[in-house]
Amino acid sequence: TIVIFTSDNGPVTREARKVYELNLAGETDGLRGRKDNLWEGGIRVPAIIKYGKHIPQGMVTDTPVYGLDWLPTLANMMNFKLPTDRTYDGQSLIPLLEQKTLKREKPLIFGIDMPFQDDPTDEWAIRDGDWKMIIDRENKPKYLYNLKKDRFETLNQIGKQPDIEKQLYGKFLKYKQDIDNDSLMKARGDKPTPVTWG
């Protein structure tokens, strides 16, 4: 049996703007942001996994992973062969669970498409190694941070690290092009009207 425990992203906004947000406190360990945005406080979540004797008890890692990694990881654990006629954004975490170094093949990409989020101008974030870029709804780089040196995202490096900026932005544009050219996205047509809650 494989048990995975994780949580929804980010605690609710401090204003508790909606009735169901009242008394739903949450902390981010001082990280910038909360739910509805792309700062680390809005996207970082815990994850706990138990898989009998296959994973050492008490093992802890701070290696960045994300939800899209679970599909290839679970498929790998169950010896299930994934179809090869499509691209998977995540990658198997088996090396990490075996206490080896996880070599990322692709950057981590986060998207938010909510017109009523805290900062409605931001739509994408890309993380590659220690660097993270936040991109606005016009697909323009807006923020750049070295999360190893600046985990609280206070020192915007846009314009100060042109090589890193160009590299990250190029990877984002490739990812975005792949999404825009995906047959399911093309079949869907224009984006559907966002759902609003209460």
PLM regions: where:
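Long, internal low-complexity/basic segments
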Residues: 70, 119, 128, 133, ...
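Structural micro-motif
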Residues: 44-47, 71
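Short, flexible loop/turn motifs enriched in small residues
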Residues: 39-43
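C-terminal cap/loop subdomain of S1 sulfatases and analogous C-terminal strand-loop tails that border
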Residues: 11-38, 55-59, 63, 68-147, ...
